[in-house]
Regions:
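Surface-exposed, short loops/turns at beta-strand junctions within beta-sandwich domains
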Residues: 203-211
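Glycine- and acidic-residue-biased ligand/ion/polar-headgroup-sensing regions
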Residues: 25-45, 64-70, 75-78, 84-86, ...
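Compositionally biased low-complexity segments at domain edges in trafficked proteins
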Residues: 99-118, 241-274
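Alpha-helical linker/edge segments of TPR/alpha-solenoid repeat scaffolds
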Residues: 294-302
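Short beta-strand segments within Ig-like beta-sandwich modules, predominantly Fibronectin type-III
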Residues: 189-195
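Short, compositionally biased P/S/T/A/G/V-rich stretches that sit at domain boundaries
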Residues: 113-163, 238-246
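Structural register within alpha-helical repeat arrays
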Residues: 257, 290-291
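Conserved aromatic anchor
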Residues: 164-172
Length: 302
């Protein structure tokens, strides 16, 4: 059995709390993600599958099997990941958690309920295939790579120094150049990758002090994207609202951050954390579904 704990600030803490059995006030945990065989022994002794959004109460038992995974959100803001075969009394899981801070915002709760419900209502929707189809249309109509950012008169506001640029891959391309310029078209940074995304550390690139810049992606086959404008957020209070202990090792933790940034319109930061969640736990389908749903819902690339 392996258990990982992380402490979140209150604004992030309640994102998935109300997505199932919202009327129940005595739950201790909500199920965020499940992989493999995970069951719950209820208060009446009945055993049922653990599903995303399920409420865990004090008298229940969480039953995990070999190679299983479940991410749990405690009602006051802690995220716990449980792995391996064991029976866990819910009350004992609570005792393993550090003290969490309290306080919620109605806006964020409503946003979280809406997001989780949208994904759960139509789980068969293949967001990734829809995105690929959209990329084909983009290429056919405009001869362009589809970068997952906002275009036209909208800036892509970001907060953190590590920025992820992602695009939908070209069928015949083997590599891509990511080029950053200033508003006068002077090149500030360039890198080459064989992936369909690139995380750029602005400090290491020497451009952390530049508040606004332009980015484009060029394939080795000569196909280019549009120019996209990125601009740093001037909200210095964000760091105080995020989380206390972020190690980048917990997929549940990354999703919480993604939702936190998405709710604030910081889509560049949100996309990075959705991507990292999917990479940390590639076998847990809901993390990649949440990422693709986010891209589709926020119309990134348009």
């Amino acid at each position: 059995m392996g258990i990982t704990r992380r402490l979140f600030m209150p604004l992030v803490a309640v994102m998935v709390i109300c997505c199932h059995d919202c009327g129940a006030q005595d739950f201790l945990f909500k199920v965020m993600a499940v992989h493999g065989r995970v069951e719950v022994k209820g208060l009446d002794g009945a055993v049922m599958p653990a599903k995303v959004g399920f409420s865990l109460q004090e008298g229940m038992t969480l039953i995990t099997s070999e190679n299983s995974y479940v991410a749990l959100l405690y009602k006051t803001g802690n995220v716990m990941e449980v792995k391996g075969r064991a029976n866990h009394l819910v009350r004992d899981l609570v005792e393993k958690l550090p003290q969490a801070k309290t306080g919620v915002t109605t806006r964020l709760v409503n946003f979280a309920i809406s997001r989780i419900n949208e994904v759960n209502e139509d789980p068969e929707t293949n967001y990734k295939e829809n995105l690929r189809a959209a990329a084909g249309v983009e290429r056919a109509l405009n001869g362009e790579i589809k970068v997952l950012l906002k275009y036209q008169d909208k800036s892509n506001i970001f907060y953190e120094n590590q920025v992820m640029i992602e695009w939908l891959p070209e069928e015949k391309a083997d590599s891509y150049e990511v080029v950053i310029t200033d508003v006068f078209s002077e090149e500030l940074y360039k890198t080459t990758t064989t992936n369909s995304f690139q995380i750029i550390d602005l400090e290491q690139a020497g451009i952390a002090d530049i508040r606004m810049f332009l980015v484009k992606v060029i394939s080795n086959t000569g196909i280019s994207s549009r120019l996209f404008r990125l601009e740093r957020s001037d909200d210095d209070s964000i760091n105080e609202q995020i989380l206390v202990d972020h190690t980048g090792k917990s997929a549940g933790e990354e999703v919480m951050l993604a939702l936190f940034f998405e709710e604030r319109g910081l889509y560049v930061d949100a996309l990075k954390y959705y991507q990292q969640a999917a990479q940390i736990s590639p076998d847990v389908n809901i993390y990649s579904v949440l990422k693709d749903h986010f891209i589709t819902t926020q119309e990134l690339g348009n």
